[in-house]
Regions:
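N-terminal/domain-start alpha-helical segments
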Residues: 1-123
Length: 125
């Protein structure tokens, strides 16, 4: 599965990309919402991992733009924000899951697989 990682922190981005690639995923990593929009136009992704604290357009705005633009794949918010209001807002805005940093890579991969199964079920109904 090809994944788009949208994370502006270089250390976390590299570590997440490497960990997921070692688990067998193809990972494209961008550091801004603007780059994410371009990547989604150019490639087909099974899953997007979206940080909320991005430079310029933040993750919540990016999520809304992606969904309005027709992206129907799985989107998982991966963020340090752990408030219930952030979780509810993100899920209501169209995220398929919400994962708080720091996270375990095995759990992240399991949640990605789960979200992709749900999305696949939606498209076959």
């Amino acid at each position: 599965m090809r994944i788009l990682l949208i994370e502006d922190d270089p250390q976390l981005g590299r570590a997440t990309q490497m960990g997921l690639e070692q688990a067998g995923y193809a990972v494209d990593w961008v550091q801004s919402a603007e780059s994410a929009h371009m990547a989604v136009r150019l490639h087909r992704y099974g899953c997007l991992l979206l940080d909320l604290a991005l430079p310029g357009e933040d993750g919540m705005q990016a999520l809304a733009t992606l969904r309005r633009g027709g992206y129907d794949g799985a989107i998982l918010i991966v963020t340090a924000r752990d408030q219930i209001v952030d979780r509810v807002t993100g899920l209501d805005a169209g995220a398929d899951d919400f994962i708080v940093k720091p996270f375990d890579l095995d759990e992240l991969a399991a949640r990605m697989r789960s979200a992709c199964r749900r999305v696949a079920g939606r498209t076959h109904e």
